[in-house]
Amino acid sequence: MAAAPSESIPSVNKAWVYSEYGKTSDVLKFDPSVAVPEVKEDQVLIKVVAASLNPVDFKRALGYFKDTDSPLPTVPGYDVAGVVVKVGSQVTKFKVGDEVYGDLNEAALVNPTRFGSLAEYTAADERVLAHKPKDLSFIEAASLPLAIETAYEGLERAELSAGKSILVLGGAGGVGTHIIQLAKHVFGASKVAATASTKKLDFLRTLGVDLAIDYTKENIEDLPEKFDVVYDAVGETDKAVKAVKEGGKVVTIVGPATPPAIHFVLTSKGSVLEKLKPYLESGKVKPVLDPTSPYPFTKLVEAFGYLESSRATGKVVVYPIP
């Protein structure tokens, strides 16, 4: 294996860990001496620069999918941006010194890694990573992988194509902000509508939304028009199926799904990030950070508390690490 010549990789590192399931405020503990993960032949070791939080992180900590989870203790964190410091013998895409980003867990809910991104070092499979776009900061890059890949996979499953209309339920969240941008700039939707609370409607318009809907005042079931695609990012498929055209598609990332809606769980792929690189580098698709970001590594519990409050607009990022 090739290792960074200029940097000796320690055997232990600082990380946040939980050893039992529960609320993040109760179970997350800072540990200054967690073992640095071993790198398999198809993996790289990353010196983490920034990480972002996703709802799956706190749902996992609560034990929502403990039947398929990896054994505790767990260093949480799916999204990572950092620098490669060591490569496995079979790795061909990356070399020591490369700036990379990705969602560490190919299958989000089945044996996710015990060594997540909320640590100084993490190991990642080559196939889930991509080269960081040069124009993006590590903070911006860390905000993207799980959210933008989820947005992309859902739009593909919904067969959105040029000239079709789409309604996004939950347009201001981490995934919703990317559904809107990808629908508009990558998939060529003719009309993008999205829901948010009153004070976030102007924010939706800055993302390119044609019709911003205040869910506190309007029922989507009663809208005068129907849509070719409805993408539910909040868990309201019972309403979503009433807003879709005959023969249209409804996808959701929050189960269970009311038929004919399709529920899916992201398969993390670095190839999707590479495919979207031109749109990110041109600025057509932009990372969306919550105004409170970034949170320092020492304030991780507060960062989770904010994410869990459902108040975030865009992504909650942790930087610098440590």
UniProtKB/Swiss-Prot annotation:
Protein keywords: NAD, NADP, Oxidoreductase
Keyword NADP annotated: yes
Swiss-Prot/TrEMBL catalytic activity: 4-hydroxy-2,5-dimethyl-furan-3(2H)-one + NADP(+) = 4-hydroxy-5-methyl-2-methylenefuran-3(2H)-one + NADPH + H(+)
Binding site for NADP(+): 59, 174-175, 197-200, 215, 253, 264-266, 311-322
GO MF terms held by the record: furaneol oxidoreductase activity; zinc ion binding
Gene3D superfamilies: Medium-chain alcohol dehydrogenases, catalytic domain (3.90.180.10), NAD(P)-binding Rossmann-like Domain (3.40.50.720)
Keyword Transmembrane helix found: no
Family per similarity comment: Belongs to the zinc-containing alcohol dehydrogenase family. Quinone oxidoreductase subfamily.
Record's function text: Enone oxidoreductase involved in the biosynthesis of 4-hydroxy-2,5-dimethyl-3(2H)-furanone (HDMF or furaneol), the key flavor compound in strawberries. Can use both NADH and NADPH as the electron donor.
Name listed for the protein in its UniProt record: 2-methylene-furan-3-one reductase
Organism, scientific name: Fragaria ananassa
Lineage: Eukaryota, Viridiplantae, Streptophyta, Embryophyta, Tracheophyta
